[in-house]
Amino acid sequence: MKQHPAILAIDAGNTSIKAALFRNSSIVSTSTVCDAEELRAWLKDLPAPSGAAACSVRPSVNESLAAVVSDFGITLQFLGSDLPADVPLEVEEPDKVGADRLANAIAAYHRARGPAIVVDFGTAIAFDVISPTGAFIGGAIAPGLQTSLAALHEKTALLPLIEVAPPPDAVGRNTVDAMLVGVVHGAAGVVDRIVDNIREQLKFDFTVFFSGGHSRIVAPICRTHAQMAPTLTLEGVHLAWSRHNRPDAS
């Protein structure tokens, strides 16, 4: 039986590069790497991709990522430039909507088949709001967990630089735990309030998705019911590639 071709999807964020190899609509393998050379090493033992697409909010790595993909004799298509997103942008500055938010909108609407809110926990906590017709209509941006912890360290004399971790309790009994309680519980409160406000203002029956590296730390504390979607951005990149590179695509 003939196998579907392998397609590589890349999400180049501010602090890391995530990648997934797809066959048809299924993910074969995923990885989080620091740079293009680590991506090349990860791909070495996987089926060679016959197509590749990326969303990038870090232009400095685009050339090196494209070079890795060119090893397979294919061209890396970047969402929003080489690769159309086909997402209506009902915002005041459509040219400033990040490629990762376009990818989230594509995948969330594909999954929900209706209005959706994506909460993406990365360097920033980004809220992407998708209308009942699949348009990106805006959202909100708040500091991410590691960003908040780093700011506490940088803007104070004595608070240490620590890594994100689940807080042990609602009350921190030492400095590190107190920082984790404040940042993680604070983020959960921000998520609940913003999602509630969006629902109250727009009156849509939203499906909510949690994505991004720190979603599993915040989700247990949130009141907001959400579907966990750790690969949502990569799914959106793959969907965009598939729509424009299938044999019958114009």
Where are the regions a protein language model picked out?
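Acidic, glycine-rich active-site loops and adjacent beta-strand->loop/helix elements
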Residues: 83, 124-125
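Nucleotide/phosphate-binding catalytic cleft detector across ATP-hydrolyzing
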Residues: 1-12, 26-116, 133-250
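Short beta-strand scaffold segments in enzyme catalytic cores
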Residues: 17-21, 118, 125-130
